[in-house]
Swiss-Prot record:
ATP hydrolysis is coordinated within m-AAA protease ring complexes: ATP-binding to YTA12/RCA1 inhibits ATP hydrolysis by the neighboring subunit YTA10/AFG3, leading to coordinated ATP hydrolysis within the AAA ATPase ring. The gene is YTA12. This is Mitochondrial inner membrane m-AAA protease component YTA12. Residues 115-131 have a biased composition (Basic and acidic residues). The lineage of its organism: Eukaryota, Fungi, Dikarya, Ascomycota, Saccharomycotina. Pfam families: AAA, AAA_lid_3, FtsH_ext, Peptidase_M41. It comes from Saccharomyces cerevisiae (strain ATCC 204508 / S288c) (Baker's yeast). It is found in: Mitochondrion inner membrane. PANTHER family: ATP-DEPENDENT PROTEASE, MITOCHONDRIAL RESPIRATORY CHAIN COMPLEXES ASSEMBLY PROTEIN YTA12.
Length: 825
């Protein structure tokens, strides 16, 4: 059989020579390999017949080439295949292939003769053993195919398809979708439905009257079967079955209340119908179990249990547990930082918080060189809490620590310890610190630790926080208990350090409290330098970072990153070649006031009111000594509700005097007072101004001690959710009167100022109606310079006319440098 298959391959190769139109193609190489396998088979067949004594075999062996000749042909084929693969075809390749084909054809003829003789010999032996008729019928299909193959080229039959893997084979894709529970449930439902359908088809309920009049009176009843003392089956006799109304039915049934009542009624009915006692209807009593009905009764319970198991597994997987069950929930979800694949952030990428960065870098130094400190008797700090407003760089510092620590770094969110299952949070804390100890020295960073570190409450009878408190207790024990985590540093980040538990903040757990505030001027310069480095700028980074840092007081690091990104987007939207100063100014306005709502069209009357409103703010800010410098006035709607805005530039001030607060309140009331002076009725546009004024006046009275009647007492509310007041009703009345007095004084002062500067208000309002936007330069042209020196040093240093003109010229120079040169052709 093996030699026969080889002969078919050889015949196919010889009868169908390779098309050399695609000489270097894969088809040609496959054909050569087929011929090469033919040589191997021929040599094996030849070596197997070497020791035979039969004369015909010996004669045939003489016709077959010797081993040396076969080996020579083999080497020719190997050389030919190698040349084809390496694309080194000789010039006489046609002649070379012709010789190889002739050699293969000669070998094929010899093998065909040998195989034919072998089959004839086997046929003779079978004829001698079984007779000619049986031997003739036992001729194999292979022999007939072999004999017919000498005259025509018949392709071999296709190989049988591979067997399909069983359903329980893991390699079978169907098995992956098979769920035993689904199969069982489907089978049960189908069985129940089939049983129910069969019951409905076979049964038909009737009443007692129908049984008596239509069946019993007409003699169609063969017997009665009382099932489970509640139902009676009326079995029909042959006469009843053959009736047209009962065709295809074997029985009817009706229900009974009790057996005694049924027997009494049956006896009475038979007496009334004069049925002879020898022909009375026999009654049988049986107990039957309806498995489908029983299964249907327990089906809701089974489905409920299965649903609970399914939901448990799904929630376990969604919560990060392993697929093995809910026991995987106890594993920590902390992720180990990979310095090769994760975001690569170094300490040089962190700016604006130099003091905090030094503290964190010292932790890294502790872990890298512990002997340097231990030889002095110092112990490595256990942990540090990073606190501060959002966007100041707490998480960024942790990322930089992971990038430069050189030790295993694990980071996890505080909310990942909170689960719906009891004990999961504490188990995850144990697993986290166990992993950290095994890989010590290491660093663990817990972001938003206030999710599990809130202060424990006294008298908590509801039990709502028991699970969170258990997680916190486990955290306290792991950080500084009987098994301290030596050489494991814990860093944590939070925006609310005031609500954390005192036991968590004590030395020995979090030894250092690092507060990261919003950056000052120098910090903003450094942050802008980091972000501007990645942008294509039209000006110099040094000049831009100074001006932008002065324009963004109170901005956090995240706000500055957003400004740089928005400026790049605006430049790309405008098809500019580089990011310019005006793009950054637009981005700052977008971050402060929101996007311009150009589609929000104001009526002429509303636009006029907004213009006078903003003109009142601008004039008050221009002539009040302690007001912040005015940068821009606009009546273009921005954000959700602002119909206009005045942009001021406060400095990095840490102390506010009473006069400064009153000047700010007076400036905030300038819009409403301007409406009162120029229109017969006021509008609702000053609602936000009133909130600011009331808040400042209340703080002056209740917190800052700037009221003579209240004095030096702090009545600040402990919490916004606290419904009680820290003062009496009489004190509350005094506070209200003092707040009103301060606001009224500011209002009277603002009214007096705007009446004196009525021409300036009119002038600014008219220009605003025409241009919609006024800059500081426009204000100087209209009103002259401010009568007071600016109290913001950064304003004078980086926002003066000289610096502005310097940046503009630098941008123009770069534009000319980047312009395409005219063609000389």
């Amino acid at each position: 059989m093996l030699l026969l298959s080889w002969s078919r391959i050889a015949t196919k190769v010889v009868r169908r020579p390779v098309r050399f139109r695609s000489y270097y193609g894969l088809t040609h190489i496959k054909s050569l390999h087929t011929q090469y396998r033919l040589l191997n088979r021929l040599q094996e067949n030849k070596s197997g017949n070497k020791n035979e004594d039969n004369n015909e075999d010996a004669k045939l062996n003489k016709e077959i080439p010797t081993d040396e000749e076969v080996e020579a042909i083999r080497k020719q084929v190997e050389k030919y295949i190698e040349q084809t693969k390496n694309n080194t075809i000789p010039a006489n390749w046609k002649e070379q292939k012709r010789k190889i084909d002739e050699s293969i054809r000669r070998l094929e003829d010899a093998v065909l003769k040998q195989e034919s003789n072998r089959i004839q010999e086997e046929r003779k032996e079978k004829e001698e053993e079984n007779g000619p008729s049986k031997a003739k019928s036992n001729r194999t299909k292979e022999q007939g195919y072999f004999e017919g193959n000498n005259s025509r080229n018949i392709p071999p039959p296709p190989p049988p398809p591979p067997p399909k893997p069983p359903l329980n084979d893991p390699s079978n894709p169907v098995s992956k979708n098979v769920n035993l529970f689904q199969i069982g449930l489907t089978f049960f439902l189908l069985s129940f439905l089939l049983d129910l359908l069969n019951s409905l088809e076979e049964q038909s309920e009737i009443t007692w009257q129908d049984f008596r009049e239509k069946l019993l009176a007409k003699g169609y009843v063969a017997k009665l079967i009382v099932v489970n003392k509640s139902m009676v089956k009326v079995m029909l006799n042959d006469n009843g079955k053959n009736q047209a109304d009962n065709y295809g039915r074997n029985f009817y049934y009706f229900t009974i209340g009790s057996i005694d009542s049924f027997e009494h009624k049956l006896q009475k009915a038979q007496d009334e119908l004069d049925i002879d006692k020898d022909f009375r209807i026999p009654v049988l009593y049986v107990q039957e179990g309806n498995w489908a009905k029983a299964m249907f009764q327990i089906l809701p319970t089974v489905l409920m249990i299965a649903g609970i198991i399914w939901l448990t597994r799904r929630s376990a997987q969604a919560a990060g547990g392993s697929r093995g069950g809910i026991f995987g929930l106890s594993r920590s979800k902390a992720k180990k930082f990979n310095t090769e694949t994760d975001v690569k952030i170094k300490f040089k990428d962190v700016a604006g918080c130099d003091e905090a960065k030094e503290e964190i870098m010292e932790f890294v130094s502790f872990l890298k060189e512990p002997s340097r400190y231990e030889k002095m008797g110092a112990k490595i700090p256990r942990g540090a809490i990073l606190s501060g407003p959002p966007g100041t760089g707490k998480t960024l510092l942790a990322k930089a620590t992971a990038g430069e620590a050189g030790v295993p770094f694990y980071f996890v969110s505080g909310s990942e310890f909170v689960e719906m299952f009891v004990g999961v949070g504490a188990a995850r804390v144990r697993d986290l610190f166990k992993t950290a100890r095994e890989n010590a020295p290491s660093i663990v960073f817990i972001d938003e630790i206030d999710a599990i570190g809130k202060a424990r409450q006294k008298g908590n009878f509801s039990g709502a926080n028991d699970e969170r408190e258990n997680t916190l207790n486990q955290m306290l024990v792991e950080m500084d208990g009987f098994t301290p985590a030596d050489h494991v540093v814990v860093l944590a980040g939070t925006n609310r350090p005031d609500i954390l538990d005192k036991a968590l903040l004590r030395p020995g757990r979090f030894d250092r409290h690092i507060n990261i505030d919003k950056p000052e001027l120098e910090g903003r310069k450094a942050i802008f330098a980091v972000h501007l480095h990645h942008l294509k700028l039209a000006g110099e980074i040094f000049d831009l970072k100074n001006r932008l840092a002065a324009l963004t007081p109170g901005f956090s690091g995240a706000d500055i990153a957003n400004v740089c990104n928005e400026a790049a987007l605006i430049a790309a939207r405008s098809d500019e070649d580089a990011v310019k100063l005006n793009h950054f100014e637009q981005a700052i306005e977008r971050v402060i006031g929101g996007v311009e709502r150009k589609s929000k069209l104001l009526s002429p009357e509303e636009k006029k009111v907004v213009a006078y409103h903003e003109a009142g703010h601008a004039v008050c800010g221009w002539y009040l000594k302690y007001a912040d410098p005015l940068l821009k006035v606009s009546i273009i709607p921005r954000g959700q509700g602002a119909l206009g805005y005045a942009q001021y530039l406060p400095g990095d001030i840490f102390l506010l005097t009473e006069q400064q607060l009153k000047d700010r309140m007076t400036m905030s009331l300038g819009g409403r007072v301007s409406e009162e002076l120029h229109f017969p009725s006021v509008t609702s546009g000053a609602s936000d101004d009133f909130k600011k004024v009331t808040s400042m006046a209340t703080a002056m009275v209740t917190e800052l001690g700037m009221s003579d009647k209240i004095g030096w007492v702090n009545y600040q509310k402990r919490d916004d959710s606290d419904l009680t007041k820290p003062f009496s009703d009489e004190t509350g009345d005094i506070i209200d009167s003092e707040v009103y007095r301060i606001v009224q004084e500011c209002h009277d002062r603002c009214t007096k100022l705007l009446k004196e500067k009525a021409e300036d208000v009119e002038k600014i309002a008219q220009v605003l109606l025409k241009k919609e936007v006024l800059t500081r330069e426009d204000m100087i042209d209209l009103l002259g310079k401010r009568p007071f020196p600016e109290r913001n040093d950064a304003f004078d240093k980086y926002l003066n006319d000289y610096e502005t003109e310097k940046i503009r010229k630098e941008e123009e120079k770069n534009e000319k440098r980047n312009e395409p040169k005219p063609s000389t052709n």
